[in-house]
């Protein structure tokens, strides 16, 4: 019971036993992100209970961002990324199974390949597998495989490798599925009077910080310009980062092509062609 006699509110997610996502994976991912809170990182949804089929979290009301909340999120996200990871594709430290992003599989790299740059990781682990999956569902245009193969050659050669933001280590600790729906802003009525952001539903791994920022842009996060400006002020992004946004969006768009079909396959190929 709360101090006023009210029953604390919770939210329980139910998971399919046959799906790729797993409540214990999500709990481990949330815990890994939450480690950065003590250093000023973004607030993460609190896990209250986890089983093989359910995950119970604090109830998280969502509202319109309060004044300054977008800027606070940008600064805090930079610190979450700065918490780092051992290598690209690194899983949460308390997880040894497969990964997932929504209802799609997501590979982890349990042992870091020597001198594995971001571009090679991105093509090998985040693009090529989803080209195969999307093709299995006939979700890509006829030229899709060839377009991604050509882009893969450039990625593997390191042509799009870029430094992390200033505060981040060589590998950032990223949310991994940071679209607007996984970003909640607590309203002024929040129990603690806190009006900042809370992150939910991660696909946490070692990655490039620009991937999370590109995901925020993909489906239109609220007050995106303020979030990005505050992030850049706290942890300056590498030169030319706006030109790489669409490159980092390729993975989630391919995931959508695999899961939902429709126009996502064509969108993925159009984005890829920008980098040929």
Each language-model region and where it sits:
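ATP/Mg2+ or Mg2+-diphosphate-binding catalytic cores
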Residues: 256-276
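Active-site Asp-x-Gly
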Residues: 116-123, 132, 167-173, 180, ...
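An alpha-helical support segment within catalytic cores of ATP-dependent transferases
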Residues: 85-175, 186-194
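Short, solvent-exposed loop/turn segments at secondary-structure junctions
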Residues: 17, 50-54, 61-63, 127, ...
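ATP-binding pocket architecture of kinase catalytic cores
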Residues: 8-117
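Hydrophobic alpha-helical segments that form the core
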Residues: 246-254
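Domain-level recognition of nuclease-like catalytic cores that cleave nucleotide substrates
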Residues: 65-73, 122, 263, 267-270
């Amino acid at each position: 019971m709360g101090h006023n006699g009210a029953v604390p509110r919770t939210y329980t997610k139910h998971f399919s036993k046959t799906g790729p996502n797993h409540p214990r994976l999500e709990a481990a991912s949330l815990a890994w992100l939450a480690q950065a809170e003590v250093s000023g990182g973004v607030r993460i949804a609190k896990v209250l209970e986890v089983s093989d089929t359910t995950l119970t979290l604090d109830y998280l009301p969502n509202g319109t961002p309060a004044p300054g909340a977008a800027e606070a999120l940008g600064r805090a996200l930079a610190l979450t990324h700065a918490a780092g990871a051992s290598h690209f594709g690194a899983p949460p430290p308390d997880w040894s199974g497969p990964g997932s992003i929504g209802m799609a599989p997501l590979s982890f790299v349990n042992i870091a390949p020597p001198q594995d740059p971001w571009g090679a990781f991105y093509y090998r682990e985040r693009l090529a597998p989803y080209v195969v999956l999307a093709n299995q569902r006939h979700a890509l245009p006829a030229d899709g495989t060839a377009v991604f193969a050509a882009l893969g050659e450039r990625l593997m050669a390191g042509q799009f490798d870029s430094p992390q933001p200033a505060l981040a280590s060589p590998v950032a600790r990223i949310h991994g599925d940071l679209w607007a729906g996984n970003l909640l802003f607590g309203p002024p009525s929040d129990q603690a009077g806190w009006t900042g952001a809370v992150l939910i539903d991660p696909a946490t791994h070692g990655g490039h910080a620009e991937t999370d920022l590109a995901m925020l842009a993909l489906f239109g996060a609220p007050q995106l310009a303020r979030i990005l400006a505050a992030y850049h002020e706290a942890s300056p992004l590498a030169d030319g980062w706006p030109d790489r946004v669409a490159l980092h969006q390729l993975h989630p768009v391919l995931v959508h092509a695999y899961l939902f079909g429709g126009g996502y396959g064509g969108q993925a190929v159009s984005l890829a062609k920008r980098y040929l």
